Amino acid sequence: VGESHDARLMAPMDAVRVAKSDPDSIIGIKVRIGRIASGPSGIDPLVIALQVADATGLPLMCHIDQPPPSYEAVVDMLRPGDVLTHCFRPFPNSPLNGDGSVKDAVLAARARGVMFDIGHGKGSFAWDTARGMIAQGFPPDVISSDIHQLNINGPVYDQVTTLSKFLPLGMSLPEIIRASTEVPAKAVRRADLGTLQ
């Protein structure tokens, strides 16, 4: 059972209090949405998390897994500077239409400043999705791993392996490095990080 299955267990007032009490450590608000993570609560935990992000002035990161809710419903709610992780996930709930084109809601989200993060985990990254997105001029903003005990021995292994997967997909080495250093630092409003300058 995902942590957001029962919205009564979410504690938005406590989250705001804790975030404000330690601004050097708490850099954003994260919520997990999808059939596995939020189940019968659907998209409601995202509504609550957005309110917490607004109250704290922090960016929001949203995990997406299998539907419901749909990819479109999730990205439609995200604001400029918010981050969608597991963005190149496979069907169902891929950012691609059945014909392989990028969904209009995904294009609109990027145009308004939503950031797209790989969050490569065990089942949250698909080569076909990544190939289709990048071929259509939609590379990820952030390349990160979602490494844990179930994927450290594959398919993730480590961050360097995750980064290397984007070379054969057509991203340049400087683009890949920026997506793993400079861009995520800016996403968490710490532009002083992620650079040797």
What are these regions (language model features)?
Residues 1-33:
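Divalent-metal coordination cores built from histidine and acidic residues
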Residues 9, 64-68, 186-188:
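Short gly/ser/thr-rich secondary-structure transition/capping motifs
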Residues 5-9, 13, 23, 39, ...:
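Electropositive phosphate-/nucleotide-binding environments in soluble metabolic enzymes
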Residues 17-18, 75, 196-197:
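Short secondary-structure boundary/capping segments
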Residues 31-132, 136-153:
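Active-site core of metal-dependent hydrolases
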Residues 128-197:
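His/Asp/Glu-enriched, well-ordered alpha-helical/loop segment
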